[in-house]
């Protein structure tokens, strides 16, 4: 059993002082009942806690789904350009979050931010066969021969060796690419190699985690307990 203020402060969203104020204001409920004290004891593994009517995921690590906009770097800091961490409030930036994999500056879509280093490593390692799915709009025509080339794996003109990947044609000038690796500019390089340079790219999913369609560009939310569990299962944890 742990104190309520300690558990909520560990999420990185509030300080203990802020938790005490929220409890005093009647904003915090534990298992449906208004908390009477910030020192109240609870089991973070089983307790259902809400703050201001919003469910709070109580867990050791922080997991954030971000709908990355174009024009922002997938980095923790940069002296000249805006990074994805700058899209988060200060209390989350203090959590030591890092992006799981990098989306190019001009690429949009799903980006997982976490302080769970072991999970991040496994999601990115080809050893664990975690699919990353992208939607691309291209200049040029793609056909069954290109899908076959993706399925067999390919070596690009610059020497990059690409593992077998999925290419689903979505009508004129659009496709879905599924990879289990994430080398530098890989989707763009593979499609350009097949004569279809990318003009728009968006990541849709990583393993079982799919971009929430209700998240506007630049918005974020906590992963649900079910989403975290599914990711960890996929990564063999």
Identify the residue ranges that each predicted region occupies.
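Basic, flexible Lys/Arg- and Gly-enriched helix-loop patches that mediate nucleic-acid binding at interfaces
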Residues: 1-237
């Amino acid at each position: 059993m742990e104190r309520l203020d300690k558990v909520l402060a560990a999420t990185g969203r509030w300080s203990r002082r802020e938790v005490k104020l929220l409890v005093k204001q009647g904003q915090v409920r534990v298992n449906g009942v208004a908390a009477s004290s910030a020192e109240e004891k609870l089991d973070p593994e089983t307790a259902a806690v809400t703050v201001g009517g919003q469910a709070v995921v109580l867990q050791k690590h922080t997991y954030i789904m971000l709908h990355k906009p174009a024009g922002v770097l997938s980095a923790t800091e940069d002296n000249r350009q805006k990074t994805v961490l700058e899209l988060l409030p200060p209390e989350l930036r203090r959590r030591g979050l890092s992006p799981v994999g990098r989306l190019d500056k001009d690429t949009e879509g799903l980006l997982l931010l976490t302080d769970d280093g072991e999970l991040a490593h496994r999601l990115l390692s080809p050893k664990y066969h975690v699919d990353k799915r992208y939607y691309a709009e291209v200049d040029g025509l793609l056909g069954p021969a290109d899908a076959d080339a993706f399925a067999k794996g390919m070596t690009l003109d610059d020497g990059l060796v690409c593992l077998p990947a999925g290419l689903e044609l979505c009508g004129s000038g659009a496709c879905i690419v599924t990879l289990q690796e994430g080398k530098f500019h890989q989707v763009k390089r593979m499609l350009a190699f097949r004569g279809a340079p990318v003009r728009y790219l968006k990541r849709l999913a990583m393993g079982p985690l799919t971009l929430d369609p209700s998240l506007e560009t630049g918005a974020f939310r906590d992963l649900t307990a079910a989403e975290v569990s599914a990711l960890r299962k996929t990564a063999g944890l």
